Structures are given as C-alpha cells and as structure tokens.
C-alpha cells in the first residue's frame, strides 16, 4: 500500500496527542493503532507493530517535512492547552471518537508570514547544524549533495536562504575558503529542508552490484520449487519408481491436497496439471512485476540523468562482459605519462619567428573579475552537471546570488596573489571512459576530469577575457575551429573539405593530402610550452602568473567504473598535459598549436581552391583541436608541409600516432603510392584504393562515400530507436528519447551527406513501422499528429525532413554571412557547384517554412481529413478548451501503448462496424448497426456517449467517477478530509461535517446528477 501524506499527518499528530507531546509514552502503541483503524477502517488489517513502525519511518526518513512536523506540534500544543478533554483517560486504552474527530479535522491554518517564518527557522536550524557538522573538515572529504528536482519549493528555499541567512555569514573579510564553506553548508541546509538525504559516509556511494529485491527472490524460489516438484511428478508418471522419488511425490501430493479449497486431485496427471498451472501463474507474475520495476527504474533514471540512461542502452546492446585493467597498470600508465616534467625546445627557430611576428599584438591589461563577469559565466552553466571533488553543483552558485560580488572580489585577489589558492582548488576527479572494447589496455581510455565548480567558474571568466583578447588582435587562425565561438565546428570543416575533394575529383586536379593524428595530444603538451604561449600572445601578467602557479598544483584521482568493478587510484601529479573537462583547456590547447598554422600558411604550398582567376584561395591545412589534415598540389610540397609539422611537433614534445597517420596522392585523377619517412625512421603509409580514413566522424577516400555512410547511419538510427522502444519509458519520455538519442545520429550528417526526400521519407516510414510493431502507433492513425507538438494534440516526434531542410538553410546562411570577412569561406561558397548538399553557388533556393508555418499547415491538413479531421474540428469549437483538451499529452505519464490507443480512438480508426463497412469496405459486414442496442450505426461517437444499453452501466459509472473527483476536491478545499487518494479508490462518505461546512452524498439519475454538478460548479 501507499502511505499518503494525510495518513502520515494523522499518525504523527495522534501520536503527539496520545503522548502529550512525547511527555508520556506509556502504552501508546495500542491507543495509536485503535485511533488509526477507527479513522481508516479499510486498513483495519494493519497490525499494531506496523503502525508503530510507520511512525518511526515518518520521523527517520522525514516523510513529513520539518516545517510540517513543527506546524503539527504547534497545533497539538494549542489544542492541548485549550481543551483538557483531549487528555487520555487513565482507565481506557484508546481515544474516544470525539477526540479522534477533533484531531482528524484539525488542519494547518497558518498565514503566509507564519509559514515564511517557519521556513526560515527550519533553514536556520539546518544551516547551523551544517556549520557545526562540517566545520574544520577537508572540502574533499565532505559528503555528496544529491541532485534536486527543480521545483518551486527548491527555488523558494534557495531564495530564502540567500536573502535572510547568507548576509549574516559573508562580508568583505570572508576568505575564499570560508565563502566556499558557507555555500556548501547552505546547499546542505536547503537540500535537507527539501527532503533530501545526505549520507555522512562517502563509502556508501561506491558502486555495488544491484541485488534482486525480496519479492523477486521469493517468486524465483517459489518457481524453482514448483519446477522441481513438477519434474519429480513427471518422472514418476513416466515410470521411475525409486523409493526416494516415491516419498517425494507422496509429500508433493499431500501438500497440494492440504492447500486447496477446491475438489482434491484424484490422480498424478491432475497433480501435474495443477503444478503446470501454478508455474504459469507465477512466471507470468514474475514477468509483470519485473516489467513494473523496470518501468519505474527506467523513467526515474531518464528523469534524473538522461545521459546515464542512454549509456545504459549502449551497454545493454553489447551484452559483452568487459574486463577492466588492473589498478596497478592503470596507475602506472597514466603516472608515467603525466608525472614526467618534459620541457619543449625553447631554442627552436620558429619560436623566435613567432615571437617577432606577434609584436604587433597589444598587450593585455591586468584583469579584474567583476560581478558582471561572474553572473554572465554562471548563467551559462548547467545546473546539475557533475561537480568536482568539493561536491557543490553549479545550481548553488547560480541561485545564491548574494555570493557573486564577494566571489568576484576573491577571484581578483586570487589572480594577484596566486599563492592564496586553496589546496582543493586544483584537485580533480578523472573519469576514464573506454574508447573501444579493448578495456584491459589502460591506454585505451579517454580521461575526462571533473574539477571543483568554483575553479571552473574562475577559469571560465579567464577564458572569456583571453578569448576577447584573441579576437581583438586576430590571433587565432580561421583554419582552427576547435575553440572558435559561433562557428559550426566539425561540420564546417567537413563541408570545406568536401568542396576541396569534389572539385579535385570532378576536374581531375592534382591533390595530395595527409592525415595527422597526435598520440595523447591533450595529455602530452608540455607545461613549459603552455607557459611560453601565454607570453608570446601577450596575455596579462596576473593571469599568466596565476595559470603558471596552478599548473604546478594540478593533481587528479583516476576513477574507472566498469560492469560491477570500481577502481580508484592514488592522486597523480599533473606535470605534463592539460585537463580535459575545463573550459580554459580547449582555448589554451589551440593557442599552443596556433604557431603551426602560421608556419604552414607562409609556405604557400597548399591546394588552390579555384572559382575563377579573381576568386581563389590557397589552403594548406584544416585544424579541429588536434585533428590535422594537410593539403597540397604536389607530393614534394606535401612532404615539405609534413616536415614542418614534424619539426614543430618534435620541438613541443608531441608525438604522432603513426598507426593513425596516412597520406593520399592523386595525380590527374589517378592514385599514386608514396610513403613519407619521418626523421626517426617511421613511415606514414599511403592509402590504397580500397582503404578509407575516418576524418571527423566520416569515412573518406578520394571523396566521402555517401551511399555506404547513409546505410550505416540508417542502421545505427534504427538500432537506437529499437533499443528505446524495448525500454519501459512512458509515452512522453519515449518520444523525447527518440528525438534526443536517435535523431542526432542523422542530424550530424545533414549538410555533408546527400539525403534525398525519398531517403528521409523511408526513414520516417521505418520509424512509424517500429512504433506500430511495439503498439505505440496505430497503423491507421493520423501520421500528421506524430509530428505536431503535444500542446497542439500531437506527439512531438521530430520531422526529419523539415529538420534536414532547416539545417541546410542555416548552414547556407552561415557561409553567406562569412563571405564578407573570410576569403576561405567566400571561395568555398563560389566553388561549391553542387559538390555538397548545400550547393552554395546557387543562391536562389527557397528557404523552408518556419516552425509556426509548419505547425499551422499541418493542423490545416489534419482538419481537412474526412475521418481524422473530425476530432480537431470538434476541439476548435468555441465551447471547447483546446489547451485543457491536450494537457494530458504534455503532463500525464502513461504507457505509450495507452497513449497510442487513445489517439486511435480520437482519430476514429477503431474497428467498429461502421468503420469496417464504410472505410475498410469490408463486404462481409452487411449491417453496421450497434451490436448492443441495434438502434443506430456503430460509430465511436455512439459507443462513448449514445448507446442505450451502456447508459445504466458504463456511462453511469463514468459520471459517478466525475462526481467522486468533484466531491473529493470540495472536501479537501473545506478541510472535511485530510488524505488525498486516487479517484478510483475514493469512496465518498454519506455525510461529512465540520463546525462551518458539510457535504453529503446521494444517488440520483443521470439527468439530476448533471444538474447538481452544474449547480456546484456555478457556486
């Protein structure tokens, strides 16, 4: 059963009445039990022990908030002071009915100000407890604060603490360490007042193998027992007659006869049939219970952590037991990589050249962090992204606005005095994500580091300052798109690359390319080079000093969770490389590789993108972070570019991943094989005709293989849709999961891969087929509704065709806007003569319809349908509230199968006689009259509201349910009842009264009932 809040309030309040506010607990359990079953007679089967246990659970697990508990205490205290008859009599063991009724009708009657004061009191109490509990504790050892549902209550609690409590603890003399401590205690106080549990023991959160619940163990044990008994009887019937088996079979038959209320079995075949039926019952029950548990687990996980839910889908699809590396090998490999303080070559000639070249740059002034900087940075942070080792989420810094000005002040002081940086500031937790199925190799992991949120806020402010300096002085080259704001990233590079490859292929021009892959690029760049880069590009002195200091303090702990194994290493000092997971890291890393772009561009040895003699551009390379592709018109020139890249990489101590480096040589449309030998003797092999290279996510050779890539993407998309439909998500969550997990597989290819309308229509058709296969979409329901928003009566599935058209249009506009400032983009725009799906050379292409136009057109088309259009026509009438009509689609969490069935009813595609005869043209149906009343045609409208045979049964039951809802709402509003129960379980009492209100229940005909309901609603 489910304990409602009203029940919990009654138990807690009655307990206080009986014990006189816990001053006399003598024999209270029997009195509490009697009072409870008197108030809730339908729960008379609950034992005295169970009621006493529930009282303890209410207090221990805070089933009633602290505010509610204090409120009930005040009410009981006032009641005891004003009415002595509430005292428990000495010669009786139970409360009398008047006392029970007095408390049962006692409801909260505090005003808004009193409620606010109680909230503030509770917050202050929890805040003081947190200050006492966590004072003088290591910030890295404090317990984790769980994520909270973003509710009005949470915002109210946060605002109250921010306005009334924090100002008493934060002032101009507060240090950064103290500020961090106060924010943590504030987060703990708000979380606890919001009902969250904060475990003191951090070991409690280690990954444990999920054991089956008790009900599952009981059912499995019972099924195993039945199968064992069934097997023994089967063997006995087949002729096995050992003495042991005979005794066992006799015991089984005796047990079956003793536990039956029906006619006893007379032979062994009947006993076997009985066991077979029991086995079927229990196995089906186990299946149902597991589905229910999966449904609850899937939807809860989807609500709180979509990313983790999608990751579990990927893990479940592989069904492969992955073996992690040993803790020693994991620690050893990454320690060897990070703890070696390797220096770059400061005497390299190109460093002198780069230093001389950048003399034109205006030096960056010393930076001060302002409150505006803090607000702008924090507003762009995700509320509940994984926190660092200090366990404070972004939400608390965002909503504790009183701290922003003091945070800016402390950050400015920190930039000017880096030695004041707290020790925990630079400690990270690095989560190791496997790159492939070779999980035993510690090098096959991608390290993602979670740093303290307060550190990331500071580095985000610094990043904005540095990026503005780079923009003002035009420092970053346009060939690098890894950290460029407002760029299109990988897709922009792929479009430029596609134009180059297709122009070369169609015109049979010479093109020589090389793919360069760095081995552990982020993890191997020397700190000495990162420091010198800041000096070369004239970053402000205080930022440079601060970054130099914190680099010397970087350390992290590796965490690897695989299957049921969790590995945690000792802290590792970071003396080489840069964190992956910090907003400053991409920009800093791109600055470290920026001189290479200058060295390559000054050679003028690239490939010439031509439109005509006036519009052309020589391109030598494209960069996306550390993914480098070189272009040249001859093999000799390409070798020169490779030599420059090799020299630069060697000087900054970054190594090539030789296995992933390739060259390709096309002369007059024909392939040639020329390997490139590095100075160390290693070879970069040339690609042969059948070999492809995965560049930024797409396999390519002389060009992108559109057909094979499309087939791969379609297969992956449909596989993700299938994996989603196999889960137990609710209808709304199922559609959202398809839009956010499956559709992006295709979205990334829009603008790069040639998709025709036929391709996209077939994908949508396959999607609808899968929905139909899983009973989520009726095969004859309106397909238009699938792609309409839920607020308009649809289901919210993304229309892939419109999404494709919109992305193509947006990319075209982006390139056209860049032509004024970029010669590269201007040349690519003129050169793209249907080489890519954008067809940038053709400017007279109509844009797709806007979102509003698309919705309006679809609704009009839906209305014009002769059968499907009846429902929207009814909803569009003035007497119908269309918003309320469609609310259930947006707010109710119902099964996707139920949702699809309800929409099929609205679309009137249920197999009624009228539908079979007039829509299906079924010649076997000669009479379409109702099979119950035989008075008129059997349509959906007739079945749900006009059949005389259903009037006194189904219709009356439906109207009674409506009356129950109204009855309960009125009773709750006027404090006649305290417990809200589901309407289908609610049984109205004949008469309920208080001192000022009463409500009665009677049985009337349908017409009179409707009149009474109208009168109640009018009042």
Label the predicted regions.
Residues 1-36, 62:
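Eukaryotic helical DNA- and histone-tail-recognition domains of regulatory proteins
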Residues 108-125, 129-136, 228, 235-443, ...:
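Surface-exposed loop/turn segments and immediately adjacent short secondary-structure elements
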Residues 550, 561, 655-691:
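Short, conserved micro-motifs composed of acidic
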Residues 271, 278, 282, 739, ...:
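Extended C-terminal regions of large enzymes
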Residues 101-239, 246-247, 687, 702, ...:
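Surface polyanion/phosphate-binding segment centered on an Asp-His-Pro turn
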Residues 681-757, 775, 810-823:
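Basic, alpha-helical interaction scaffolds
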Residues 920, 976-1019:
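Active-site metal-binding core of divalent-cation-utilizing nuclease and nuclease-like domains
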Residues 359-595, 599, 897, 934-954, ...:
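Conserved pre-catalytic core of RNA-dependent polymerases
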